[in-house]
Amino acid sequence: MIINDPVTLAEVERVFARYEAALLINDTEALAKLFWESDKTIRYGVNDHQHSAGEIAAFRALGPSTDPARELKHTVMTTFGTEFATASTMFESPSQPGRLGRQMQTWAKIDGAWKVVAAHVSVIEAP
């Protein structure tokens, strides 16, 4: 198995950037397209959790859940072969001084398109 094949890594970096851009403006349609349309898709948020693409879409419809001024740091993408990847990042937001956010996503290439199949977000006191 090839780890971080350059072509695959570039694909994942691009789709992650699209996800981040959609998240910051709460583009719910774009976000929904980036998640696997399945009842097996899971998202664990800071104060919430969803166990299907439908539940995730309903959560997103409630309104923005992210500070649009958040700043990513220590972002790491790792690909395994050509159809599986993880994206891990930390973030800081002016609206939450002294707090450090952590976000992890599992991506799979399904029917030729990269989709988030599992995601987890948490926030801790900054060390």
Q: Would you name each region that the model predicts?
A:
Residues 42-44:
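Polytopic transmembrane helical bundles with strong interfacial aromatic enrichment
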Residues 35-36, 91-93, 120-123:
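Short beta-strand segments enriched in hydrophobic/aromatic residues
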Residues 1-38, 49, 126-127:
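Short, low-complexity N-terminal intrinsically disordered segments enriched in polar/charged residues
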Residues 11, 46, 54-99:
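Surface-exposed, charged secondary-structure patches
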Residues 37, 80-81, 110:
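Structural motif
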Residues 51, 94-97, 124-127:
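A short local loop/turn or secondary-structure capping micro-motif enriched for an aromatic residue
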